[in-house]
Amino acid sequence: MKTRLIFLFFLGLLVTPCNATYSILGFDPRTGEIGGGVQSCVPTVTMVLHGEGDVGMVAAQGRPRPEYGRAGLKYLRAGLDPLRAVRAVHEGGFFFTPWGGSKYEMQFAIMDRLGRAAAYTGPQCSNYAGHQIGRHCIAQGNLVESSRVVSGMVYAFETTKGPLKYRLMAALEAAQANGGDRRGMMSAAMLIVKNGSKEKNGVVLDIAENMNFLPLVGLRAQLSKVARSSPFDASSDTRKDNGSNASNTKLRRP
């Protein structure tokens, strides 16, 4: 009986939409990389981030459908700026999702290959829900502890030195340090793309921690493993400051 209840619990989580989620998109003008990081209480968040190196990146959460991510990239590819792309995705979105919610429960951010960004937070998203644009980044969250979760991501990204992946990691850790997801942690992911990369869609990094109650710890461990296997990353001066103390960094500015 106990085993059955545990199975039903996790089965319920598997069909739960990405409510109670925070994410950030960032741009490195030095390298041209565009990346995203996300953490949620659901078992997997691999459907949140969508990116192409020569186009941009989308983070769709709240009541996500893969179509929202693909649509965002399609509109960027067609020449729309992020703000117009956000409007087009919202106006063309399905009213009902597979989980019975409306597009007004959706939250998504779009960043183009130049680092310009825009976002939409639906009026029916669970509090706290909101987004904030920073320097070369945009952060968003729904059903998180407070607005400090979102602003903390922006602050950590802006003040952490080093490669884009470490700045994104620092932002996720800062979000958790400021209260994070109100329903806990179970998954995290990071995706980085770059125009000119030989990999499909320009992907240079694609890592995830699923079904893990300490997903950010696992994600940072994966980054460390990547760094050890990459001569360029290991020899970089910026490797000395990789935001490893970000998990203890709370929002300092008003």
Where are each of the predicted segments found?
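Positively charged n-region of N-terminal signal peptides that target proteins for export
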Residues: M1-R4
